[in-house]
C-alpha cells in the first residue's frame, strides 16, 4: 500500500470514528467470504457498517476521536463495526457471533465509554432507536385518542337514545 493510499485510508477511518455512535471490535479469523458478505449485508440493513483495515492504520485513525479506547483491542485479524445508532452494530455483531463461532466479539466503545464483551451484549439487548421512538409516539398518541373517544361518547349515546325513541314511535 502506497503512502498516499495509507493516508487516504486513515482519513476515511478517522471520519468514520468521529461520526460514529458506537464501535465494536471482533476477530473474524476463519470466516469465509460468503460469511463476511452476510455480515456486511446484515450490518447495512441495520444501518451499520463493517470495516477491515490494517490495525496500525486504524490505531492512527483513532487518535483524537471519542472511540480511541478500542485501540487496545486491535490485535490480530480484527473487524470494526460502527453505527450512529448505539444499538444497531452491537445487536448485529452479537447475533452473528451466535451463529458463527469464528466471529468473536472482543469489545467496543460507545462514545468515550469502553465496553467489554458483556457490555456489548447488554447494549445489543436494548431496543433500537426506532423501536423506542415508536413506543414514545404510541404513548403520546394514546391520551389524545382517549380524550377524543371520551368527548364523542356523550354525543354518540344521545344519538342512540334518540334513535331508540324514534324506532319505538315507528313500531307503535
Swiss-Prot record:
It comes from the Bacteria. Pfam families: Ribosomal_L10. The keyword Membrane does not apply. InterPro entries: Ribosomal_uL10, Ribosomal_uL10-like_sf, Ribosomal_uL10_bac, Ribosomal_uL10_bac_type, Ribosomal_uL10_CS_bac. Part of the ribosomal stalk of the 50S ribosomal subunit. The N-terminus interacts with L11 and the large rRNA to form the base of the stalk. The C-terminus forms an elongated spine to which L12 dimers bind in a sequential fashion forming a multimeric L10(L12)X complex. PANTHER family: 39S RIBOSOMAL PROTEIN L10, MITOCHONDRIAL. Belongs to the universal ribosomal protein uL10 family. This is Large ribosomal subunit protein uL10.
Amino acid at each position: 500500500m502506497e503512502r498516499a493510499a495509507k493516508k487516504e485510508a486513515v482519513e476515511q477511518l478517522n471520519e468514520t470514528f468521529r461520526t460514529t455512535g458506537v464501535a465494536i471490535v471482533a476477530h473474524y479469523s476463519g470466516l469465509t467470504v460468503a460469511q463476511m458478505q452476510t455480515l456486511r449485508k446484515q450490518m447495512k440493513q441495520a444501518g451499520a457498517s463493517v470495516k477491515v483495515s490494517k490495525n496500525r492504520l486504524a490505531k492512527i485513525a483513532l487518535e483524537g476521536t471519542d472511540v480511541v479506547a478500542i485501540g487496545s483491542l486491535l490485535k490480530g485479524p480484527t473487524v470494526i463495526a460502527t453505527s450512529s445508532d448505539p444499538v444497531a452494530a452491537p445487536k448485529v455483531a452479537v447475533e452473528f457471533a451466535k451463529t458463527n463461532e469464528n466471529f468473536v466479539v472482543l469489545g467496543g466503545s460507545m462514545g468515550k465509554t469502553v465496553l467489554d464483551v458483556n457490555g456489548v451484549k447488554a447494549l445489543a439487548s436494548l431496543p433500537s432507536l426506532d423501536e423506542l421512538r415508536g413506543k414514545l409516539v404510541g404513548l403520546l398518541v394514546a391520551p389524545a385518542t382517549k380524550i377524543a373517544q371520551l368527548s364523542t361518547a356523550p354525543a354518540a349515546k344521545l344519538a342512540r337514545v334518540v334513535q331508540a325513541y324514534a324506532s319505538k314511535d315507528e313500531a307503535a
